[in-house]
From Swiss-Prot:
Residues of this chain annotated as glycosylated in UniProt: 439, 664, 875
Keyword Transmembrane helix assigned: yes
Major localization class: host cell
Keyword Lipoprotein: no
Membrane-topology descriptor: Single-pass type I membrane protein
Signal sequence bounds: 1-17
A GO cellular component annotation in the UniProt record: host cell membrane
Extracellular topological domain residue ranges: 18-1042
Species name: Ostreid herpesvirus 1 (isolate France)
Entry protein name: Uncharacterized protein ORF59
Transmembrane regions: 1043-1063
Intervals, Cytoplasmic compartment: 1064-1080
Higher taxonomy: Viruses, Duplodnaviria, Heunggongvirae, Peploviricota, Herviviricetes
Localization annotation: Host membrane
UniProt keyword terms in alphabetical order: Glycoprotein, Host membrane, Membrane, Signal, Transmembrane, Transmembrane helix
Length: 1080
């Protein structure tokens, strides 16, 4: 197999070498590091388009080659460039160029190369440059290679052109300027948006650079993306390239100078406007347009609509989708549009009356002639509105033909234009009203014949005498309608320098150039062969809505072909601060779930920031000259906590620019269980936490221009800290009982949560349960019975547990968005273990503080239920639970890990007894004569667990205000299993000092004790809870020591004070005369 592949590869190489002119026995060796070859991409300049330069250093070689793909030639399109020169051909640049031109026909090679290539020769070396007419990406070039052949193998170097050019940004006129991508911004254009359509723009900013951007980057595309697969993409080839300096062919037109025009040459197409022509013809459709342009408005502003229409076949336009409705066509409502003739046409390619080519489209040539005639013949008559229609010349019986222009009551005069080939027919028509013979160095010899007639009440028919002329008359003609009501209707061909200027120039006499140089440059294309025409039209038409028809892209300078046969395109004026492309989108599409409409645009391989429609709509609605209420964003409800038990609701902020325009700022607040409440700007509505979380799912703010609504879960903080703890117990092998508690899950309603049971890591079918709607998620204790005898096999080790799933789904008429799932395994039970009660889990399940209630919650369980195989049904079991807490005393909220803790003595909270009659019936009973409102027993016949809620006031009452943390322990006394103790520490510095209600605590009964082996990882004790522990004894000794030390200090102080007083009195007496202190 290996030998076969080698043989095949050898055959391919030999065949390729023979095809390209290489020696059959010489291989091709790629050497990208060869110092004798330099291959590089040359960006466009003022003189040339983009180029590929191959420089071979002086040396001993016989052949030089440059190619755009050596090994894939068969797959390349027409116009493939493969140049292989011998050194002996380097006599002069002219001979080099001549040989390059001879390598391919002009009609293919010139589509890639402007004037073929240039060769330069120095001392034994050669420089070969291929200049491209099209941008490299447009002709889809993968790689370029250049190389030389000496006495041995052919050596070449490869340039991956697309990879090389991509990302080259900066100032093309300054080689030292920094290279960076442009800044791309997405915005909504206020001045061209309406209450039914919005214009989104994608703009490239100059970043302060005043010169043009790097001109060599071929990746010039713009793309708009939005929700629901909205996507509009188009090419921007050549818009930023330096304007050409090649002389243009200008027609000397008679009549008023304002109607003089000039066509675009090929250099203009490649450097400013358009870089190639379509090879396909669009299907024939007949939309109606209004021709309208103000000749004095050079900035493309201030157009006024009229009712003039233009009806012609639109194959000569590239504006339309293949699938548009024939009768209703959507066009961008800019005040102008661009026409382009799809293929080069002249008179000799136009079908004649007696020789009709079925593959030859009728309308391309005749539309071109029609526009030309409007400029050449009508002159100042264009002050009247004009409509144009292409019709067929019908041959009658005998030697005559007729042209029929349909009747129109508003038409004042009918004109008909047809053509006569004067190169083959010298006989003039005898019945023509007017003849204009037009022939100069820029066009082929052609005669245009104009027939005219005043208004009639029927279709206007012109008859043509065919005597001697049947073989010379065109098959198609053009009807031109002059309206009775004068209007401003000008038809203007796009000037050559439009793409580099902000304004349409005044095409006066000074713009008319000498046409003698037209034939000197073979690259120029003659008048009537190709051209881009600029027309204007009004918005006085109707259409059917179709989303694809709104993918209308507009760009700077000249209109570009945007995805042929798929998207519309028009032109737009250039902007001084950057380049702008735009797309129009219907408001009805945007207003449907506006918060889901996220837009972004891309230009020059750089993305803009993402923006939602809501971020742009208020600016469009309130910042322009018109106020569009339907576009204003309705205010949405907002919620914040006012205290521990209440929330405040308000209707959000209205855009300031809308308020400045006088919008009513009142809103009506409503909810699932909230009656309509009128709120003025800044006003709030108070609601309790329970009512908000339990009774309401959605809040709404209704204004005169719309309704803003939000789900409760969206208004509350996220559940990033939501955690669930809980336990499952086996009552027997047919029953599972579970409960859970949660932290920071306050934004959930219990009716949105379901429990999914799992055994051995698999969901149990049919075991899922919807939690009670009467409980909040925060207080979600529940029980569930499920037979597991058939699933759990003892003594095989199994696991059982459950997870909580938030299944809140928001239903809309568009789509369903599932709420983010909250999942956490609350408990995993291992069965099949030895019945060693030292392995029992702690009786203290959880100690936590409520996020809003501020209560410390202590949850306990009768954990012997967790191991049913260790419990016999014959034995009656009773266990007493003693719940105690103690606190760490401190003055700082920071935990002092490096210091010994100063703990208070243990305080009794609650004393509860649980009784199991041996048949699975469990009875809980608080040992108290007074009801404790802070004690919850969760179904004393089903679930072996209870919970105690401890307020901050109670903690302060027990220990004083300076408690940094709490420790909780439970001591159980069992008649048959003894006592064990479990301790769990609780720390929460931020919540420790909340003020809440003071609960009623019953008096605590005495606690007895018993002795047994305690479980692992718990605090060991053998004392009764009423007897002092070792910690308590240590605390008492410490206090006695402090008291003794204090007494000793006081005694010493009194002694020292007495001695001092005696000393002072003695010294005072010594200073007095003896008789002063003697007794009298």
């Amino acid at each position: 197999m290996h030998k076969l592949l080698v043989i095949i590869a050898h055959i391919i190489v030999c065949a390729y070498a023979d095809f390209t002119g290489f020696d059959n026995e010489a291989g091709a060796v790629e050497n990208n590091n060869d110092n004798n070859i330099n291959l590089e991409y040359k960006p466009p300049t003022l003189r040339h388009g983009a180029g590929i330069s191959c420089v071979i250093r002086p040396g001993d070689f016989t052949h030089v080659a440059i190619s755009n793909d050596f090994f894939n030639r068969a797959n390349l399109p027409a116009g493939f460039v493969n140049v292989n020169l011998e050194v002996t051909d380097f006599a002069s640049s002219a001979r080099c160029k001549a040989q390059l031109e001879s390598l391919a026909p002009d009609d293919t090679l010139t589509t890639l190369i402007t004037g073929a290539a240039n060769c330069e020769i120095d001392q034994g070396g050669v420089t070969m440059v291929v200049y491209l007419k099209k941008n490299p990406e447009e002709i889809y070039l993968k790689n370029w290679r250049c190389g030389y052949k000496g006495s041995g193998d052919y050596v070449y170097k490869t340039l991956a052109l697309q990879k090389t050019i991509k990302g080259q940004w900066g100032d093309s006129t300054d080689a030292d300027s920094p290279i960076h991508p442009p800044l791309i911004t997405l915005a909504a254009r206020v001045e061209t948006s309406t209450e039914t359509e919005i214009t989104l723009t994608c703009q490239r900013n100059n970043r302060g650079v005043t010169t043009t951007y790097f001109t060599g980057a071929p990746f010039k595309t713009v793309e708009f993306t939005g929700a629901e697969n909205f996507r509009a993409k188009g090419d921007l080839y050549g818009r930023d390239l330096t304007p050409s300096v090649v002389p243009q062919c200008v027609i000397n037109t008679p009549g008023d100078p304002v109607f003089k025009f000039k066509n675009l040459g090929p250099e203009d197409y490649s450097s400013k406007c358009y870089s190639g022509f379509l090879s396909t013809t669009l299907p024939e459709i007949k939309p109606k347009f209004t021709l309208l342009r103000n000749p004095y408005d050079v900035d493309f502003n201030g157009y006024e609509p009229n009712d003039v229409t233009m009806d012609f076949d639109t194959d000569s336009l590239f504006l339309f989708d293949r699938n548009v409705n024939m009768d209703r066509v959507v066009i961008d409502k800019h005040p102008y549009m661009v026409m382009k003739f799809l293929k080069p046409r002249n008179f000799h390619e136009t079908p004649l009356l007696n020789h009709v080519d079925p593959n030859q489209p009728k309308h391309t040539f005749m539309t071109s002639i029609s526009f030309t005639m409007l400029n050449l013949l009508l002159g100042q008559q264009l002050h009247k509105a004009t409509a144009i229609q292409t019709v067929e010349v019908i041959k009658n019986s005998g030697d005559s033909a007729s042209i029929t222009c349909p009747f129109d009551s508003s038409v004042e005069e009918y004109l008909a234009i047809f053509l006569l080939d004067t190169s083959t027919c010298s006989v003039s028509l005898s019945n023509r009203n007017d003849v204009v013979q037009y022939n100069n160095s820029c066009v082929d010899p052609t005669n245009f014949y104009l027939l005219s007639s005043r208004s009639t009440s029927n279709d206007q028919t012109f008859t043509i005498d065919l005597t001697g002329n049947e073989a010379c008359i065109s098959k198609y003609a053009t009807c031109i309608y002059k309206k009775k009501v004068p209007g401003i209707t000008n038809i203007l061909l796009l000037p050559a320098d439009f793409a580099s200027r902000d304004k349409i120039p005044d095409l006066s006499d000074k713009d008319v150039e000498d046409t003698d140089n037209c034939e000197e440059d073979p690259g120029l294309i003659k008048t009537l062969e190709r051209g881009i025409r600029l027309l204007t039209f009004s918005d006085s038409y109707s259409y059917d809505y179709h989303l694809d028809q709104y993918n209308v892209l507009t760009g700077d300078g000249c209109a570009q072909l945007i995805n042929p046969c798929e998207y519309d395109t028009t032109a737009s004026a250039m902007k001084e601060l950057g380049r702008v492309a735009s797309v129009r989108v219907p408001i009805r599409f945007l207003n449907k779930f506006p918060d889901k409409k996220i837009w972004q645009c891309s230009m020059y391989d750089t993305d803009s920031d993402k923006m939602s429609w809501n971020e742009m709509r208020d600016n469009v609605a309130c910042s322009g000259t018109e106020l569009y209420k339907s576009l204003i964003t309705p205010p949405k409800p907002s919620v914040y906590r006012s205290d521990e038990n209440n929330f405040k609701i308000s209707c959000g902020i209205i855009h300031r620019s809308c308020i400045n325009k006088g919008i009513n700022t009142s809103a009506v607040l409503s909810g699932t269980e909230i009656e309509d409440t009128l709120l003025e700007e800044g006003e709030e509505f108070t609601i309790s936490q329970y009512d908000l979380l339990i009774k309401n799912k959605v809040l709404k703010c209704e204004t005169e221009w719309g309704v803003g609504e939000s789900f409760i879960s969206d208004l509350l903080p996220t559940n990033s800290g939501c955690s669930v703890s809980g336990s499952c117990v086996f009552i027997d092998m047919n029953t599972i009982r579970c409960f859970y508690d949660s932290k920071n899950c306050y934004s959930h309603n219990i009716n949105n949560v379901k429990v999914v049971f799992r055994i051995n890591d698999a969901d149990v079918p049919g075991a899922n349960v919807k939690l009670s709607e009467t409980n909040r998620f925060e207080d979600g204790f529940f029980h569930f019975l499920y037979p597991v005898a058939s699933i759990v096999s003892i003594p095989t080790k199994n696991t059982i547990g459950f997870k909580l799933v938030d299944e809140w789904q928001r239903e809309t008429d568009e789509f369903t968005v599932p709420y983010p799932t909250v999942e956490q395994w609350a408990f995993i039970l291992e069965s099949g273990i030895e019945c060693d009660y030292t392995e029992l889990s702690s009786a203290v399940l959880d100690v936590s503080m409520g996020r809003y209630t501020g209560e410390t919650t202590i949850t306990l369980q009768y954990d012997m239920y967790n191991f049913p195989e260790c419990k016999t049904n014959e034995n009656e079991t009773s266990v007493d639970y003693y719940l105690q807490i103690r606190g760490e005393i401190g003055t700082s909220r920071a935990r002092r890990e490096d210091e010994d803790k100063s703990m208070t003595e243990w305080k009794n909270l609650v004393y509860i007894s649980v009784h199991d009659d041996g048949d699975g019936v469990v009875t809980w009973q608080p040992i108290s004569n007074q009801r404790d409102y802070n004690l919850d027993i969760f179904d004393n016949k089903i679930l072996a667990a209870f919970r105690y809620r401890l307020t901050q006031e109670k903690i302060t009452e027990l220990f004083g205000p300076y408690i940094n943390s709490l420790e909780v322990r439970v001591i159980t006394e069992s008649l048959d299993k003894g006592v064990y103790e479990a301790t769990k520490e609780y720390l929460d510095q931020t919540m420790a000092y909340r003020t809440l209600m003071i609960p009623r605590i019953p008096p605590q009964p005495p606690i007895t004790t018993a002795t047994t082996q305690p479980p692992i990882d718990v605090m060991i004790t053998t004392q009764s809870p009423n007897k002092p522990t070792e910690d308590e004894k240590s605390l008492d000794l410490e206090m006695i020591g402090k008291i003794i030390l204090l007494i000793a200090f006081v005694i010493v102080f009194v002694i020292l004070l007495t001695i001092g007083i005696i000393t002072l009195v003695k010294r005072h007496r010594e200073t007095l005369p003896e008789d002063e202190y003697l007794l009298p």
